[in-house]
Amino acid sequence: MSLAGGRAPRKTAGNRLSGLLEAEEEDEFYQTTYGGFTEESGDDEYQGDQSDTEDEVDSDFDIDEGDEPSSDGEAEEPRRKRRVVTKAYKEPLKSLRPRKVSTPAGSSQKAREEKALLPLELQDDGSDSRKSMRQSTAEHTRQTFLRVQERQGQSRRRKGPHCERPLTQEELLREAKITEELNLRSLETYERLEADKKKQVHKKRKCPGPIITYHSVTVPLVGEPGPKEENVDIEGLDPAPSASALTPHAGTGPVNPPARCSRTFITFSDDATFEEWFPQGRPPKVPVREVCPVTHRPALYRDPVTDIPYATARAFKIIREAYKKYITAHGLPPTASALGPGPPPPEPLPGSGPRALRQKIVIK
């Protein structure tokens, strides 16, 4: 439940409403437009024979669709007189012009003088404004405005006219001397600061730790040297042209600049950094170059029976003949005799490769 509905009504409620309604002036727009809306006596032009309360229905609505005449030649019946329609009513607009109030000449002159003394916020143009300002507040504001005006007038009288006296030659010289001293002090301070800056030598900052430098340049292109040409003196041929004849004469044609190529260099500050980025693995074992015992040449093959390297077919035949003589003189090994004729089986040797399992025979 709202507070307005539950509280008791005021005793003075609605006292000013009647005064506002009486003070409301009529707008001239509705008195002149469309001939005015005021009621005039003897205006019977828009009064009909029948009352406006009765609802009149057109004759066309009384006829049913089935009862319409089939021919159009019949005379149309006169329609009944319709009700007169008047213009719609609009809400009157409030007038913006101030209401003229008849006041005596003496009181209006006095009010105009008091109005000129007040500030713009408190000036009343005589219209019926709806400002709700208490009389005591308006009086205090007026007194404050008068005090401010009086204080401003006293300050103007105290200051008087403002005029500057031209300085004499002695006063100008004294001011110039003071300015010169200030300039000398400023110059000395500036020179001292410049000297301090020169003393502080800018040292190149060195970066601690390893450094990798990347440098890319262009260099002239150097081709690979070709086969050296030998001068051969053959009778009946023309002599070789001289060097002066081979060189082109100046101005005979455009000289092409030498070709250039780019080269990039990466420099490491120490070896540890280089090894960190480019680690070197263990060097591969270089295989031992075996020599043929017959021809003393690099061996290309190996005998599967005697495990002796050889280079040529003749060396292979010599190795086999020596092997047969060895078997004839010393006989086969125990394992070979048990297995019968044929190539001897390999001897098992612990910790040896597949080549070490073969039977080795040294030929002297």
From Swiss-Prot:
Modified residues (Phosphoserine): S127, S129
Alphabetized GO MF terms: DNA binding; histone binding; histone chaperone activity
Localization, UniProt: Nucleus
A GO BP entry: positive regulation of double-strand break repair via homologous recombination
The record's account of how the chain is modified after translation: Phosphorylation is enhanced by ZNHIT1 and promotes the interaction of VPS72 with histone H2AZ1.
DNA-binding region(s), chain positions: 156-206
UniProt-annotated stretches for the region Disordered: 1-164, 233-258, 335-357
Keyword list, A-Z: Chromatin regulator, DNA-binding, Isopeptide bond, Nucleus, Phosphoprotein, Transcription, Transcription regulation, Ubl conjugation
InterPro entries tied to this protein: Vps72/YL1_C, YL1_N
Glycyl lysine isopeptide (Lys-Gly) (interchain with G-Cter in SUMO2) cross-link, renumbered residues: K115
Primary localisation category: nucleus
Disulfide bonding pattern of the chain: none
PANTHER family: VACUOLAR PROTEIN SORTING-ASSOCIATED PROTEIN 72 HOMOLOG (PTHR13275:SF4), YL-1 PROTEIN TRANSCRIPTION FACTOR-LIKE 1 (PTHR13275)
Protein name, as recorded: Vacuolar protein sorting-associated protein 72 homolog
Organism annotation: Pongo abelii (Sumatran orangutan)
